Swiss-Prot record:
GO molecular function: O-methyltransferase activity; protein dimerization activity
Primary role: O-methyltransferase; part of the gene cluster that mediates the biosynthesis of the phytotoxin solanapyrone, a causal agent of early blight disease of potato and tomato. The prosolanapyrone synthase sol1 is a polyketide synthase that produces the octaketide desmethylprosolanapyrone I via sequential condensations of 7 malonyl-CoA units with one acetyl-CoA unit, and one methylation step. The octaketide backbone is further methylated by the sol2 O-methyltransferase to yield prosolanapyrone I. Prosolanapyrone I is hydroxylated to prosolanapyrone II by the cytochrome P450 monooxygenase sol6.
Keyword Transferase in record: yes
Active site: 327 (proton acceptor)
Keywords: Methyltransferase, S-adenosyl-L-methionine, Transferase
Family: Belongs to the class I-like SAM-binding methyltransferase superfamily. Cation-independent O-methyltransferase family. COMT subfamily.
Listed Gene3D superfamilies: Vaccinia Virus protein VP39, Winged helix-like DNA-binding domain superfamily/Winged helix DNA-binding domain
Protein name: O-methyltransferase sol2
GO biological process: methylation; secondary metabolite biosynthetic process
The species this protein was found in: Alternaria solani
Length: 427
C-alpha cells in the first residue's frame, strides 16, 4: 500500500488516508508472508527468548520487513492518536537513563546467560541499592530487555542477551548512552552560543565536555578503546563488495583515511587481482594494520602515513577510496579533503574513480519513514559529536564542484547508510 501525503512525497500508508482496517489487513497479510518466507528458507520463527537468531538480510525479507514495519508504526499512531503518540517520544529520555545505568554498572554481563539472578545479588555485585536496581530492570523489561520471570528475579531476553554476547555492540550502546547521550543534552546551548557555526569546536560534544571529541579520546584512552570497538560494529562489507565492479579496476586502490586497513584487507581477499595502499594520519592505526596476519595477502597491501588534508602524493592509481570519513567533517573541511585528491587523480589515468563510501541521505519522503529516521538519526549524531553532517547526493555534488569544477558524479552505486558515490575528474 503506497499513498501520497498532502505535500506529494511518498509516505506509505498515512494517517490522513489509511484506515485502521486497511492497515490491520496489510499487517496480517505481510506477517503471514514473512512467516512463510522464514519457514521456506529454513529460518526459525522470531522469538523473545535468548538464542533467537537474527533475521536474514536478504532482499526478499527486507522488502517484507519494510512494508510490515511501516504499517505497524502507522497503525500504532492512529490507535494512540496525536496526543498519546507524542508521550513516549518526549519521555524516551527516562528509558535511555535506565539503559545508561545498565551499561555503566554491567547488568548485561552480570546476569547469567541462562537462568536468572535475584535483584539483591545483582545489587550487591554492582554496589548500589536493590530498589534502584530493580526499578532500572523493570523499566528495561517494558522494552523486552530483560524479563522478570518471578518477583525479584531477572533473566535475559533475546534483546538483552545480544548485549551480553556481543562486546562490540555493547560498546556501541555504551558509547551512545555515555558520550553521545550527554552531549545531546547540550544541543540547544551549542546552537545558542554559535548560531551560524558548526564544526568540531562548535559542537554539542565540545559544549558539554569542553573539548572536541577526538581530543577527548586522546585524553581518555579507556573511552577511546571503547569507541574503537563501537565503530567495529559497522565493519560489514558485503554491500560494499557487491555494489561496485571492483574486479574491473586496473592497478592499485589507495584507501585514504583507511585506519588499520580492515576494509582493504577484506576487499583484497575477495578480489585477488587488486593491490591496496592504506593511508592514515595515525601511526597507531597503521601499526595495528601491519601487526595483523597478512600472510594470505602478502605483498598486496602496504601502509603509508598521510593526512587527507594534504595533497595526494600517489599517482598512477587504479582508484582512490575514502570510507566513512566525510561525515566527520564540516563542509569547508570536506572541500579541503576533496581538493587533496586532485593531484593524485591528475597523475593517474583518465577515468580513474574517486569512490566515496559514506551515508547518502535520501530526498525527504522518498523512503519509508522508519528507514529515513534511521539515517537522520545518524545525521543528528554527526552534529552532536562533531558539528558535522551526513549528506545527500546533491550536497556531495555541490562540495565536489566547490573543490574542483572538473569533478563529476558518474553514479551513486548504493545509497542509505552504506552509500557509494563514484566520482571522476574530467581531465
Amino acid at each position: 500500500m503506497a499513498l501520497k501525503s498532502t505535500n506529494g512525497t511518498h509516505a506509505g500508508p498515512t494517517a490522513s488516508a489509511a484506515s485502521l482496517a486497511s492497515l490491520a489487513a496489510n499487517i496480517s497479510e505481510k506477517a503471514a508472508s514473512l512467516s512463510t518466507y522464514l519457514e521456506s528458507q529454513g529460518h526459525a520463527q522470531p522469538s523473545f527468548l535468548p538464542g533467537c537468531a537474527d533475521p536474514p538480510e536478504t532482499e526478499e525479507y527486507l522488502a517484507l520487513h519494510t512494508s510490515l514495519t511501516s504499517s505497524l508504526e502507522d497503525l500504532q499512531r492512529l490507535v494512540d492518536g496525536p496526543r498519546r503518540s507524542l508521550r513516549p517520544f518526549i519521555m524516551i529520555g527516562n528509558d535511555l537513563a535506565a539503559l545508561q545505568v545498565a551499561f555503566d554498572f554491567g547488568f548485561f554481563q552480570l546476569i547469567p546467560p541462562e537462568g536468572s539472578m535475584d535483584v539483591e545479588t545483582l545489587a550487591h555485585k554492582v554496589g548500589i541499592d536493590a530498589d534502584r536496581t530493580a526499578r532500572v530492570l523493570r523499566m528495561l523489561a517494558t522494552h523486552r530487555i530483560f524479563v522478570e520471570p518471578k518477583p525479584g528475579f531477572f533473566a535475559h531476553t533475546a534483546a538483552s542477551a545480544v548485549f551480553h554476547d556481543d562486546e562490540e555492540l555493547r560498546c556501541a550502546g555504551h558509547y551512545m548512552l555515555d558520550e553521545c547521550f550527554k552531549a545531546a543534552t547540550a544541543c540547544s546551548d551549542c546552537i545558542k552560543a554559535s548560531p551560524n557555526d558548526s564544526d568540531s569546536t562548535h559542537s554539542p560534544f565540545n559544549t558539554y565536555f569542553g573539548v572536541p571529541m577526538f581530543s577527548y579520546y586522546e585524553q581518555n584512552p579507556q573511552f577511546a578503546a571503547r569507541f574503537a570497538k563501537a565503530m567495529a560494529v559497522d565493519r560489514q562489507i558485503a554491500e560494499l563488495r557487491d555494489c561496485f565492479p571492483w574486479g574491473d579496476i586496473k592497478g592499485t586502490v589507495v584507501d585514504v583515511g583507511g585506519g588499520s586497513g580492515h576494509i582493504s584487507m577484506a576487499l583484497a581477499r575477495n578480489f585477488p587481482k587488486l593491490d591496496f595502499i592504506v593511508q592514515d594520519d595515525s601511526e597507531k592505526m597503521l601499526a595495528q594494520g601491519r601487526a595483523r596476519n597478512l600472510s594470505d595477502i602478502e605483498g598486496r597491501i602496504s601502509f603509508m602515513k598521510h593526512s587527507f588534508f594534504h595533497p595526494q602524493p600517489i599517482g598512477g592509481a587504479g582508484a582512490f577510496f575514502i570510507r566513512q570519513c566525510t561525515h566527520n567533517w564540516c563542509d569547508r573541511d570536506v572541500v579541503k579533503i576533496l581538493k587533496s585528491f586532485v593531484p593524485g587523480l591528475e597523475n593517474s589515468a583518465p577515468g580513474t574513480p574517486l569512490l566515496i563510501n559514506d551515508t547518502v541521505l535520501p530526498v525527504p519522503g522518498s523512503k519509508p519513514l522508519h528507514e529515513e529516521r534511521a539515517l537522520r538519526q545518524m545525521d543528528m549524531l554527526m552534529f552532536v559529536v562533531l558539528g558535522a553532517k551526513q549528506r545527500t547526493a546533491k550536497e556531495f555534488e555541490a562540495l565536489l564542484k566547490e573543490a574542483d569544477a572538473r569533478y563529476e558524479i558518474r553514479r551513486v552505486h548504493a545509497d542509505g547508510s552504506m552509500g557509494l558515490v563514484e566520482v571522476h575528474l574530467n581531465i
